[in-house]
Regions:
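Non-catalytic scaffold segments within catalytic domains of secreted glycoside hydrolases
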Residues: 1-218
Length: 218
C-alpha cells in the first residue's frame, strides 16, 4: 500500500506521497508502545486486485488507492446493510490473522454490531450477536488473546455515513418523540442473558413484557 500510494501520488502530480512515511527514528520510538490492538469489525468482503480498471473510482480516493474490487456473496442474506452482512467465520478469521500478523497482541473488540431499519423484535440482530460471539469464542480457543468486547451500540444514534436510516442500537430511540423515548429491543434482553450466565443459549427466549433491569452483581 505504501508503494502503491507513492506511485499513484507521483502520477497524479503530487510532489510527494499523499501517505507520509515514518522515519526510522519514528518507527523505533513507537515500536512496542501499544497496550492492545483495538478492532472495529462488522462484516466481511471478498476482495480481488483490480489494476486494469483505473477509472472505477474517483481519483484520488481511498477506493482508488486500494486497487481492489469488493463484493459479498448472495447467500450472506441476513442484514439490511452491506456493512453488516452475517459472516461470523470472517470475524474468527480476522482475529486469527491479527494475532499471527502482529505477534499475538491483546485484542480489544471496540465495535461490533448489526444494522436494521428499526423495530423491537430484532431477530436478525440476535442471530448476528450469537453467531459473532460464538466466532469470538472459537478464536479464543484458537489461541487469540481477546481481552474485551463492545457491542455497537447501546442505543440508536446518528451514523456517520447513513444518518438515522440505519439503527444499530440495543435500545430503539423514538426520534418522533421529543423525549426521545428508549425501548429495549429483543437483542438487549438476549445480550443481558449472555452476560448474566456467561453462556450463549441459542434457545433462550426473553419475556419482553418484563422491564429490562440491571441485576445486582450482573
Amino acid at each position: 500500500m505504501i508503494r502503491r500510494i507513492a506511485d499513484k501520488s507521483a502520477a497524479q502530480g503530487f510532489l510527494r506521497s499523499r501517505l507520509p512515511e515514518l522515519t526510522s527514528e519514528e518507527v523505533k520510538l513507537i515500536q512496542g508502545t501499544s497496550d492492545f490492538f483495538g478492532l472495529n469489525h462488522y462484516s466481511t468482503y471478498i476482495v480481488y486486485r483490480n489494476e486494469s480498471a483505473p477509472e472505477t473510482y474517483p481519483v484520488p480516493s481511498y477506493d482508488d488507492d486500494l486497487d481492489t474490487i469488493q463484493y459479498q456473496l448472495p447467500e450472506w442474506k441476513i442484514g439490511s446493510s452491506n456493512a453488516t452482512k452475517y459472516v461470523p467465520w470472517g470475524f474468527r478469521s480476522l482475529l486469527n490473522y491479527i494475532s499471527h500478523q502482529y505477534d499475538y497482541p491483546p485484542i480489544l473488540v471496540t465495535e461490533n454490531g448489526f444494522a436494521t431499519h428499526g423495530g423491537i423484535n430484532d431477530e436478525d440482530r440476535v442471530t448476528y450477536y450469537r453467531g459473532y460471539l460464538n466466532a469470538l469464542l472459537d478464536a479464543i480457543d484458537d489461541g487469540v488473546d481477546v481481552i474485551g468486547y463492545t457491542a455497537w451500540s447501546l442505543m440508536d444514534n446518528f451514523e456517520w455515513a447513513n444518518g438515522y436510516t440505519e439503527r444499530f442500537g440495543l435500545y430503539e430511540v423514538d426520534y418522533n418523540d421529543p423525549n426521545r423515548t428508549r425501548t429495549p429491543r429483543k437483542s438487549a434482553y438476549v445480550l443481558k442473558e449472555i452476560m448474566r450466565t456467561r453462556s450463549i443459549d441459542p434457545n433462550y427466549e426473553p419475556d419482553m413484557n418484563q422491564p429490562l433491569t440491571i441485576d445486582h452483581g450482573h
